């Protein structure tokens, strides 16, 4: 009924690694800080990494205050331009994010190579969504008890527009965990939860795509090709 909350239908929702900054290891931020303070590079990064806490009470913002040449950029294009404008300085792009931000990084690396920008490099900290799911499903609890206390997964919208729904099929087939890809809007999420609950109640383990208006099974093949050309 309209008066019932989602909590009455769905017992518990556990937030996954939705934010690339939240899953960024401190050691990677420490390395970026060392590059700026000790190597004297121009470190380019997205704004949401500047305040991430690092070791010894530092952050990129505080390292900048200590004299590090750390610059916020809005895209890899900005970082490339900084490298062009500073041919005598080493420019490092601190690349973070899931599959959504990986293709622009790949394009930047290819562009730098095409232009012969030998002073441009990337500190790659991109992460993969299917690998994160695999890590959860292969956690110590699985080895100890033979199960993981999760009934299913709500697949991410933005990432899935790039990788498609195909990569999730492995988890449904091999682990018997249903996956429903949800869109961005509240109604998208509510519908995805309903679809997920129906699968659980019916004993099904399939990949369903609630966000069919933007996500296909194969995803963005051009973006995938760029990533495959650059990254292992």
Q: What are these regions, as identified by a protein language model?
A:
Residues 49-85, 129:
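Glycine-rich oxoanion-binding loops at beta->alpha junctions
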Residues 11-53:
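Active-site cofactor/substrate anionic-group-binding motifs, chiefly glycine-
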Residues 12-15, 67-76, 114-132, 151-154, ...:
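Short, acidic/small-residue loops that bind anionic groups at enzyme active sites
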Residues 143-216:
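A conserved active-site cap/scaffold subdomain adjacent to cofactor or substrate pockets
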Residues 9, 206-232:
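Active-site loops and adjacent core secondary-structure elements that bind or stabilize anionic groups
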Residues 85-95, 100-156:
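Active-site histidine-anchored catalytic micro-motif
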Residues 1-6, 10:
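Single conserved hydrophobic/aromatic residue that forms the stacking wall/gate
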Residues 1, 18-23, 48-52, 94-104, ...:
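Gly/Ser/Thr-rich loops at beta-strand to alpha-helix junctions
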């Amino acid at each position: 009924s309209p008066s019932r909350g989602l909590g009455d239908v769905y017992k518990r929702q556990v937030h996954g690694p939705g934010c690339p900054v939240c899953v960024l290891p401190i050691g990677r931020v420490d390395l970026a800080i060392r590059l700026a303070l000790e190597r004297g590079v121009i470190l380019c990064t997205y704004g949401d990494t500047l305040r991430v806490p690092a070791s010894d009470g530092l952050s990129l913002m505080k390292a900048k205050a200590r004299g590090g040449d750390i610059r916020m950029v809005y895209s890899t294009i900005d970082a490339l331009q900084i490298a062009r404008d500073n041919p005598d300085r080493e420019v490092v792009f601190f690349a973070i994010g899931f599959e959504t931000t990986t293709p622009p990084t790949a394009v930047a690396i290819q562009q730098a190579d095409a232009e012969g920008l030998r002073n441009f490099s990337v500190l790659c900290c991109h992460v993969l969504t299917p690998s994160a799911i695999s890590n959860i499903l292969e956690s110590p609890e699985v080895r100890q008890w033979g199960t993981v206390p999760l009934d299913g997964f709500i697949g991410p919208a933005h990432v899935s527009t790039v990788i498609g729904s195909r990569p999730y099929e492995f988890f449904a087939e091999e682990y018997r965990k249903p996956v429903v890809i949800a869109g961005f809007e509240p109604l998208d999420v509510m519908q995805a939860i309903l679809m997920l609950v129906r699968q659980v109640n019916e004993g099904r383990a399939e990949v369903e795509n609630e966000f069919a208006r933007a996500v296909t099974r194969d995803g963005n093949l051009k973006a995938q090709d760029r990533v495959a050309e650059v990254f292992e």
